Amino acid sequence: LVGSEMCIRDRYWVAISMSKTIIIIGAGLAGLSAALQAAENGCNVKLVSSLPSERAQSVMAEGGINAALNTKDENDSPEEHFTDTIKAACGLADPNAVWGMTQAAPELVHWLLKLGVKFNMSGYDDVDLRNFGGQKKKRTAFAQSDTGKQIMTAMIDAVRRKEAFGMVERFSHHSFLTLRLCGNICCGCVIRDEYSQETVELPGDAVIVATGGMHGLFGNTTGSLSNTGEVTAELFRLGVPLANGEMIQYHPTTVKCGGKRMLISEAARGEGGRLFAMKDGKQWYFMEEKYPELGNLMPRDITAREIWK
């Protein structure tokens, strides 16, 4: 969706011109992160969202964020984080993307600390870590039981500071309609004001889509029903390549509340929670029996399949 000489290289923005206009659709964690990085590198940012950032799905994330910080003296490393991630993805993940993510993760956690995220700490200045699925060592940084909310609060404040200096322009309560195409080049997008129903055309050098999950595709979801997937559908209709649909995540542990599923955080199993089913009148701890090495902390796809069985 790039119509200019803008790219991301080695985790940093590289822009030929510092006057590029970047349109970002979505104002959750991904959208706000992109807005911050673009603004800090001299770009003009137009941030579009149908809801305020305070209602983004990212606010609901509870468990934590993974990074091989090795504050528990377990000889953890980004390389081991990479190996665990590729294994959990059954070899399907793009190794270049996974390598970049795992190498950057420790630096990104420290960046979030500088933004003001109040991660739990062990000792004076070490980030506390907990267990999560698919990993043999503790590498999940967390902020009490509302990690997503804490990160989003810090991100929202940081973006508002950019707004105050005119570096970011917000278009809250605006929905994405379609891209503006100049031949086969993306040169902006069309949005609609949800209050006035007025259509607005936004010209830009690049469009970043960060609209979250496609919860409207599924009968049962723990995600917000406002994340319908309609933006992804419109891009697909326009011929934008859609990849990695098989990576849509199925969270194994939920509670049914009326017509909605509420998530039980993986942190519950990371802190010792055990999964069982009744068999012959007794509690059968099936994950521990079938997967003795990691037990209840097997990757989510495996755990979800075992529960379904």
Regions found by a protein language model. Name each.
Residues 40-62:
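Glycine-rich FAD pyrophosphate-binding loop
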